[in-house]
Amino acid sequence: MAPLTAAEVSSLLAELGPHAETQEKKEALGVSAYRALFGAKPEYINLFSKLQGLTIDNVFIKYYGGTLVTTRNVNKQQFLSGEPIFVDFFKKMQKLLHHIFPIAGIHAL
C-alpha cells in the first residue's frame, strides 16, 4: 500500500479541521466513530476495560471518544476486523485508514 502524499495528508487535515477545533468537537467525532463500531460489533464493548458489563444500550463512550487511538487489549484479528466499520464511518478518509490499520495492527497483541 502506497503511503499518502503530503498533499493528501494536508487535504485530510483541512477536511478534519472544523471537526476537531475544540475538545468537545473531538469527543463528538470520536463518540460517533465508537457508536458506529459498537453498533456493528457490540461484542467489542467488553474488550474495553472501562466498559466491562455494558451493552450498546448503556455504554458510556465519551472517554473513549476523546482517546480514539490508544493501546487496546485485543488480538490482531479483532483489531483488523474493525477496519471496515471505521472506513465506512470515515468514507472520505478511506485511503488514510487503509494505510494506518495494517501498520497499527502490527502492534496489536
Swiss-Prot record:
Annotated InterPro entries: Globin (IPR000971), Globin-like_sf (IPR009050), Globin/Proto (IPR012292)
Heme as UniProt keyword: yes
Superkingdom per UniProt: Eukaryota
GO molecular function: heme binding; metal ion binding; oxygen binding; oxygen carrier activity
Keyword tags: Heme, Iron, Metal-binding, Oxygen transport, Transport
Keyword set includes Lipid metabolism: no
Residue ranges crossing the lipid bilayer per the database entry: none
Subunit and partners: Monomer.
Function: Oxygen binding protein.
Record-stated family: Belongs to the globin family.
Note, other: This globin lacks one of the heme-binding histidine residues found in most other globins (replaced by a tyrosine) but has a high oxygen affinity despite this change.
The protein's name in its UniProt record: Globin
